[in-house]
C-alpha cells in the first residue's frame, strides 16, 4: 500500500510538470474577472444584488445611474491579449440596445466593445484603425435583450470572431484586423455605457470575464451541468466560495501507460498548486491517466465529474460536505466506466467570500446521484442556535462557510504512516444512506470550518481502529474551535389559542370628566331678562348648531384652511416612495439584527494553541456525516422501503421575540355570538356633527297669549324678521367684566353702517388677500365724493393697449434722482489715433505684490508618461478619522416591502377626531365571566333629555283630504315701510347709450382752462408763391452737414485750390424733431394719485337698493314681572324603550307652563369635578389694550418692497471668482503729442477735409440711400405728472341690470324635534339583586333648572385682569374710509429690497430733454433697404478736391428755366489749372440769366432727412423720382425705369430680411439661437452681450446673454441669488424661462459652471452639496465632472473654485448649493455661482 501511495505522488508530480510545460503563452496573463475589477461586490451606486441564474447564485442588477469604469492597465498590466475569450452570463432589459463593455484608448478611441440588443454588435479597432466601421462584425437575427438569462461566449482568433449563445447558436463573422493587432491599455474600460451616449445597460449580470486564448469560449459548453434543482452545476468563476468550482483550462497532454501495466488507482490526496491570478484562488488537480475498466474495489473517489448536457433552465447550487481528502465523490456504474480526463480546474477556498443574502433564497443541500430514490422529508422549520457539537468518531460537522482566507503555499505531501495495530471492533457502524433532506432553513451566521486530511486505511486489510491519531487531533482542534451553528431567529409562530378568562379587575379609578353632552332640544323663546351680573370668565364653548339658511351673500374673502377630513378607510400598501431628505438624527435604536458578512479581513497572527476544553454537551444532529470506511464489498442490495420518521427532537430553547408579521388578510365574519349583557355606560362622546334638518311642519293656528314663562336658555337665532318699531330705550346696565375672547364664530351678516369712529392710529398694512371672482355688473351708482389719496396699488394686470394718445407738452424739470446703479459696460468705441510717443519716465518704485491672478486656461493634455518604478510598500497607516457622512445616493430602485416594524411608543393623546364612518361589524369578542353585581351608586344628577325614542307603532292611515279649491286673489297689501338700506349691489352691465339730452342752459363763463396738448402736425401745405427777394441777411451759423447726395455728374474743371490742413471734428448736430407716434405701449405702473377733483354736481336720487343687513340688537328691555310659583310634580318612573315608531308630524309648540315653586335648598354636595366646557358666552366688551406680544413666527415672504434709499457703502468684499471674459474696453485717453517725426513719403489721396464755411443754400439734393439700422435706444425717462384734468360731465343714469341668477340651494336645515315616546313595553323579568356598585362616573349635566327669583342687584365687582389675547377673528367687513391720519415721522430708510419683477411696458413718455452725447456704438447690422429719402439740406461746401479724371461726355441736358438775375458773388481764390478735358457735346441753348443775389439765411431749420415722416414702400413720391433721375423723360410712363425702382426696392428689402433670418445679428429684433450661431455667421464679433432666442419663433421671449466667442462661442446665463435657490436671469435681470433653458440644452454639447466658496470652518467641516437642474445631488466626491480649479483652503485663505463641466446637460445650471442638507434653510456659507455657459 505504501508503495502504491508513493506511485500516486510521483504520478501527480509528473502530471503537474507536464501541465506546466504545456501551458500556453498567455499563462502569465491571468483570466480577468471584470466584475470584481469594477468593484461590483462592493455594490457601488446603481448596483445591487439580485438572484442569479440559479436561486443560490449571486448576480448584480445594474440600473441607469451606475458609472463603472477602471483603468485598462489595472486589468491587463501585461497588455491586452491578441486572441481571447469573453464570457458573460447576462439578462438585459427587454428592448435594450446598449453596450455591455467598452474599452477606450488613451486618445478616447473605442477599441473594443460588445453591444447587446437586436442585433448583437462586436466592436473592434486595432492600432491601425482596422477593421473599418463597415467591416465591423454584426450578428443579425440574434437578440440578447429579451429579459431572459443568456450565457454568451465570444472567441476572437486571427481574422474571425465567433459568438456562442447558450451553447446552442454559434455564429462566426470575419474580423479583418491587422496581422499584429495591438490594443492600447493606457485608456479606460467602461461597463454598460459609452462616452457621450445616453444609452446605458440596464439588467442583471452574473459573470463577465476576459480570458486569453479561445479555448475557454469553446470549452465553456463542453462542461456538463445538471439543472439547478438537484445536481451538480458549474459555479461562475467570479464567485469563489466553499463549494468546488470547475473552470475550463487548457488540456494538458495525456500520459499513456504501457499496455502491460496494471491500472493503478489514483491517489485521493489532492495536490495544491499555488496559482494566484488576480481575484482567484485556484486548486488544480492532476489529470487521470487514460485507461479503461478500472478494477472494482480499487477505485477511489476522484475530483472530476462526468460530462452532462448543459442546463435547460434554472440551475441550483450545491453544497458539499467536505470529507477527509474527498471534496467531490461521484459514483460510476458497475461496469467501471471511465471518469473523464478533466480539462478543469477546481477552485477551492477556505472561508466565505460568497456573500449570500437571505433574499437570495436558501442554498440547496447536496443531492448525490444515488440519493434520488430516497424519500424527501418535509421542510424543516428554521432552527435555533444549537449547542456546541460533540464529534463522534468518523463525523465531521461543517458550518456555513467562513470568510475566505488567503491560499497558503502547498506543503510537500507527507509520508504515508504505517498502519496501526488492529483494534477492537467499534460499536458504531457506518451511517446508513441518507434520505433526501428537507429544505434547509435560512442559513445561520458563519461558523468555523476546518478541513483536515484523515488517514485512509488500506482497502483490503481488516478494519482498523475507528479513531486514529490524526482523527483524535482533529477532534481536539474542533473542540477548541467550538463550531458555531446558530441560525438566525426562526419565523414567527402561529397565533396561540385564546387563554382562559381572567378574573374581573378591581374597580378602576374615578374617570376624568366626560365631554359635553349633546345639545338639548330648542326651548321656547323667553322674554328678555334683566341684565345679569357679570359671570365668571367661561371657557370657550363648542360651536352652535347650524342656523337657518340665509340668502346667498356676497362672495367672502378666502377662508382659513378647513379642518382635516374624516379618516378614510385604510388603503392598500402604497408603492415605495421616493427617498426623502435625511431626517434629524434619531435616538439610539435597539440593537439591530446581525449585519451582512463583511469583506475578508486581513489574516490575523496565529494565536497560541489553547488547552483542551471539556467535552461539550450533546449538540443537535448535524448534517449527514462523512462517509464511513468502506467495508468489504457486499452484493448490491435492492432499494429499501422508506424509513419511518424519527422521534421528535428535544424542545428547542425559545427563540427571540420575532418581529411582528405583516397584517394578515381580514378573516371571514364569525358567527353571531350570544347577546352580551349591557356594558357600562361609555364616556360621553364628543359633539357630533349637526344632524340633517327635519321637514318643515305645517303652520299651526295662532294660540292664545299664555302667561310669561321663565327665561329659557338662549335659543337659536330665529329667522330674520321685519324691522320692528323702535322700542323704549332701557336703562343702561352695569358694565360687565371682560370675558375671554371666544373662538372665532361663523361670519355673521353685515351689520348696519355704524357712526363714524374716531380717527384711529394708522394700522400696519395687512397681507394681500387672494383675488376674488369677478362680480356681476351692477347698476351705475351716483358719483361719490372725491376719495382720499389711496396708497399706490400693486402692479395691475396688463390692460389692452390703448389708442395712441396725443403728444403732451413737455414736463417741467423733475427733481434730481438718486445716483443710479452702475450702468452696463458700453460698447467698444472707435479706436483713437495713437498719440505721439512720450518721453521715457523715471523708474517707478517697486510695486506691492499683486493679487493672485485668475486661473489660466487648462493647458493641452500632456503626453502620457511612462510607468514609474513601483515603490516599496508603505507601512500600514493608522486608521483615519471617521469621514463625514456622504451625500444621500440617488434614489434607488424600489426595494422589497420591508417587514413591519416594532410597535412605536404610544403617542400623546390626540384631539377628538371627527365622527368616523360606521366600521364593519367586528368579530364577536370572547364571552367574559359574569361580573359581580355592583353596589347601588348614588342617584346621579338629572341628565339631559334623552335622545328621541324609537318610533311608535304604526298609526292608522288617515283618509286623504279633498283638494281645496283655489282661493281668490287677496287684496293688494299696503306698501311696507322703507327697509334699512341694503348692501350696495354689484355694478350692472354697461347700459346702452342714452338719447342725447336737450341743449342745456348756457353756463357761466368758466375760468381759463389749462393749455391743451400740442396738436398733431397738420398736413404739409402747398407751396406759397414766391416772395420778393429780401435784403441779404447776416451770415447764419454753420449749418449741420446734409445727407450725402447721390454721385453727381462730373463737373466742369475747377481751378486747383491749395491743400488744406486736417480740420477739427465738427460739433454734434442739433437734435431732430419728434418722430411719429410709436405703437401704443403696454399699460404702465399705476401712477400717483392726482389732486382731488372739484366737487361734482349733485346726482339724482338713486333707486332703492336691496334691503340692507339687519340692524344691531336693541337695548336690553326692562325686566318683566316674575311669574307665579308652580308646584313641582312627582317624578315618574322611567319607561322602557318601545318599538320605534314612524316619524310623526311635527306638533305645535305648546304654551309655556307656569313657573314651579322655589325648592328647598339641598344639602351641600361634594366638590364636583371640573365641569365641561360650557356653551360659548356672548362676546364681552373689548378689553384694554394688552402689552405687546412676543415676536410672531416668521410670516410668509411679503411682496417685494419698493427700492429703498441708497444704502451706505458695504465693507470690502472678498475677491470674486474669475469672471467670464469681459467685453472689450473703451479706447484709452488720447496720449500726449509726440515729437515731430521725419517727413514721410508721399501718401495716398487723403479723405475729405473738414467742413468749410457755410456756403449759400443749395437746391434740394436727391434722397440718399438709407443708413444702417442702429441699435435700439434705451427707453427715455418717464415724463412728469401732467396737470390735473377737468372734472368729467355727469354720466347718464344707466338702465336697470338684468335680474340675477337664482342662488345656490341653502344648507340643510336643523334636526327636527324629538319624537314622542313610544308605548311602554312589557315588564322584563326581575334580575338578581346586584352588589353595591362602584361610584358611577360623573353624569351628564342635567337639564337647565327653573330660574330662581330675581335677586337684588349686587354691587359692581372689581374689574378683572385683562384676559389673554384671543385667537385672531375672521376678517371683518370693510369699514368706511377713515379720516387721514396725522403725518407720521419719516422712518429710517428700509433695506434695499430685491429687484422687482420687470414692469410692464409703459406708455410712450413725453420726449425727454436732450441727453449728453453718447459713446460711439458698435457697428450695427445692415438695416433694411429704406425708401429713398427726401432731399436733404445743402451741406457745407467741402474743400476743393483734387483734379478729377476726365469724365465721359454727358448727355445733352434739357433747357432750364431762366433764373432771376443775382448779385455778383465775391471772387474766389484762383484754382490750379486743370488738364484740358475733352470737348463735351453741344448742349441745348438755355436762357442765360444774370447771376442772382444770395438769398437771406433761413430762420427756420428745415427738417433733416432723418426727421422727415417715414414713408412706406408703397408711398414713393413719383415726382421726387422724376427729380432724382434726370434721365427719365417727364411723364414717367408705366414701364419706365422709375416704375421699376419700387419693385427693386421691395426685392432688396425682402432680400435683406431673409438675410437677417439666415444670418441673425444678435439684436433684440434679430436674435440668434445661440452664441455659437452668432460666431458662425459673424466670426468677427467681439465678446459681449447679445440677444438669443433658443426656441425661435416670436422674438418677444428673446433674452440677453454674454457670448464668450474667445472660448469658442459659449452662451452664458447669469444666476441670481434668491432666498431659497438660485434662479437664472438674463443680462437685464429678467428671469430666463424653463423652456428657453431646455432648448439651450438641446442645442448644446456640454455645459460648464464655476462655484466658489470661502475657506471658512463650515466649508471644511461639511462638504459642499449641489443640486442640479434635474434634482440630482452632486458633490466633488461623487461626480467625475466636478474639478477643483483653485484650492484656497490649503493655504487657509481665499476661496476655493470648483468647475462643473459635464456632457450631462440636465445637471446644469446648479439650482442650490449648500453646506447643509439641500432644501433646508440655506447654509450657503458665502457660496457664489458663476454664469452657466453652454457650448453648442
Swiss-Prot record:
Alphabetical GO biological process terms: cartilage development; collagen fibril organization; sensory perception of sound
Pfam families, alphabetized: COLFI, Collagen, Laminin_G_2
Glycosylation sites: 1604, 1650
Bias (Basic and acidic residues): 765-774, 1232-1241, 1287-1296
Processing after translation: Prolines at the third position of the tripeptide repeating unit (G-X-Y) are hydroxylated in some or all of the chains.
Biased composition range(s): Low complexity: 363-376, 515-533, 650-663, 842-861, 1115-1133, 1217-1230, 1341-1364, 1376-1386, 1413-1422, 1469-1481
Gene3D superfamilies for the chain: 2.60.120.1000, 2.60.120.200
Annotated compartments: Secreted, Extracellular space, Extracellular matrix
Domain (Fibrillar collagen NC1): residue spans on this chain: 1541-1735
Domain Laminin G-like stretches: 57-228
Keyword Disulfide bond on entry: yes
Biased composition (Pro residues): 400-413, 615-624, 1029-1040, 1176-1187, 1388-1397, 1457-1467
Prodomain positions: 1501-1736
Biased composition annotated in UniProt, kind: Gly residues: 994-1003
SMART domains according to UniProt: COLFI (SM00038), LamG (SM00282), TSPN (SM00210)
Stretches for region Nonhelical region: 215-486
Region (Triple-helical region): 487-1500
InterPro entries listed in its UniProt record: Collagen (IPR008160), Collagen_superfamily (IPR050149), ConA-like_dom_sf (IPR013320), Fib_collagen_C (IPR000885), Laminin_G (IPR001791), TSPN-like_N (IPR048287)
Keywords (A to Z) from UniProt: Calcium, Collagen, Disulfide bond, Extracellular matrix, Glycoprotein, Hydroxylation, Metal-binding, Repeat, Secreted, Signal
Cellular component per GO, a single term: collagen type XI trimer
Chief place of localization: secreted
Positions annotated to bind Ca(2+): 1589, 1591-1592, 1594, 1597
Listed GO MF terms: extracellular matrix structural constituent conferring tensile strength; metal ion binding
Known partners and oligomeric status: Trimers composed of three different chains: alpha 1(XI), alpha 2(XI), and alpha 3(XI). Alpha 3(XI) is a post-translational modification of alpha 1(II). Alpha 1(V) can also be found instead of alpha 3(XI)=1(II).
Record's function text: May play an important role in fibrillogenesis by controlling lateral growth of collagen II fibrils.
Protein name in the entry: Collagen alpha-2(XI) chain
